[in-house]
């Protein structure tokens, strides 16, 4: 009998949506708008009519003042750009006999498609470690070999998307609520490669991505954590609410997500460390000094690669 995968204990609790459905860990927005007395956490109103994908990229209503909604032609170019970035990363980095970390979100789909093509064409022997329920389903859908960190604690290469990338290759991730498992897989990988479209390329974090930095928290601590973050660093902290269910988004780990909308550029390494020290915080969506290379699919059909100076 096959041993249960790393997320099997979560399925009975319905902590993640079924593929293709919104809600749970994959949704944002929704609910009514009010402030909790005596706290700095705000429960947002229905700012988005769309739903969040598995991670990384999101679909939002153009009525949301915090969202970036390009014209349809730009959106189609963005999807093509994701495909170009994903395929470039797979061609340049995936080799036979590797253990791969598979990220979450819409961009990673294109990378997995190309991995599956190469497995079939070149008879590659690859093992894939998922970062979320969505990633697990994607691995199975394309007939790739699924494993976990129990059996493969050392990962050769992790590929994932990002919500935003700054000039130093620091990332904001977690738009789809999978930030903790994404960071675990990236952290145990010998190489961490990021794929994104041209909209995610920024000089400073917050230039393009206006939904804030996700923070995964233990449910009982979301109010004191929200107060601590806003008092120490300013900005607004919101509890992420689900769309197709009543109440907050619940991660694959059974936790809540706070979105910290910061109001200035910070020293992100120091901020990341300080927030993680707050009791009740599981992890943040700040990926500092983790990405080795980032592939950006561009509007003109090219791929722009940026890497750390020492690589």
Swiss-Prot record:
Keyword field contains Isomerase: yes
CDD domains the UniProt entry points to: RPI_A
Entry EC number(s): 5.3.1.6
Pathway: Carbohydrate degradation; pentose phosphate pathway; D-ribose 5-phosphate from D-ribulose 5-phosphate (non-oxidative stage): step 1/1
Lineage top rank: taxon: Eukaryota
GO cellular component: cytoplasm; cytosol; mitochondrion
Any Pfam family matching the protein: Rib_5-P_isom_A
Enzyme class name: isomerase
Main function: Catalyzes the reversible conversion of ribose-5-phosphate to ribulose 5-phosphate and participates in the first step of the non-oxidative branch of the pentose phosphate pathway.
Listed PANTHER family: RIBOSE-5-PHOSPHATE ISOMERASE (PTHR11934:SF0)
Full protein name: Ribose-5-phosphate isomerase
Name of encoding gene: RPIA
């Amino acid at each position: 009998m096959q041993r249960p995968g790393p997320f099997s204990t979560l399925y009975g609790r319905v902590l993640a949506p079924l593929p293709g459905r919104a809600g749970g860990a994959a949704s944002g927005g929704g609910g009514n708008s009010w402030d909790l007395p005596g706290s700095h956490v705000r429960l947002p109103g229905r700012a988005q009519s769309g739903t969040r994908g598995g991670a990384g990229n999101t679909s939002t209503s153009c009525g949301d003042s915090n969202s970036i909604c390009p014209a349809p032609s730009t959106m189609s170019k963005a999807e093509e750009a994701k495909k170009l970035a994903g395929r470039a990363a797979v061609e340049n980095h995936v080799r036979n006999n590797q253990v791969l970390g598979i990220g979450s979100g819409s961009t990673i789909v294109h990378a997995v498609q190309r991995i599956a093509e190469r497995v079939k064409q070149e008879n590659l022997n690859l093992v894939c470690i998922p970062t979320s329920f969505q990633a697990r389903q994607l691995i199975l859908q394309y007939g790739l070999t699924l494993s976990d960190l129990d059996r493969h604690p050392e990962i050769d290469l992790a590929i994932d998307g990002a919500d935003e990338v700054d000039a130093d290759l620091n990332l904001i991730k977690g738009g789809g609520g999978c930030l903790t498992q994404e960071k675990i897989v990236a952290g145990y990988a010998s190489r961490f490669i990021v794929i994104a479209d041209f909209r995610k390329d920024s000089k400073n974090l917050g230039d393009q991505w206006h939904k804030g930095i996700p923070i995964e928290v233990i449910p009982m601590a979301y109010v004191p954590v929200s107060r601590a973050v806003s008092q120490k660093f300013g900005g607004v902290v919101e509890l992420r609410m689900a769309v197709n269910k009543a109440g907050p988004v619940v991660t694959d780990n059974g936790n809540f997500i706070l979105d910290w909308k910061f109001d200035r550029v910070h020293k992100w390494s120091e901020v990341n460390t300080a927030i993680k020290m707050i009791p009740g915080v599981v992890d943040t969506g700040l990926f500092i000094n983790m990405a080795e290379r980032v592939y950006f699919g561009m509007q003109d059909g090219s791929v722009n690669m940026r890497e750390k100076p020492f690589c």
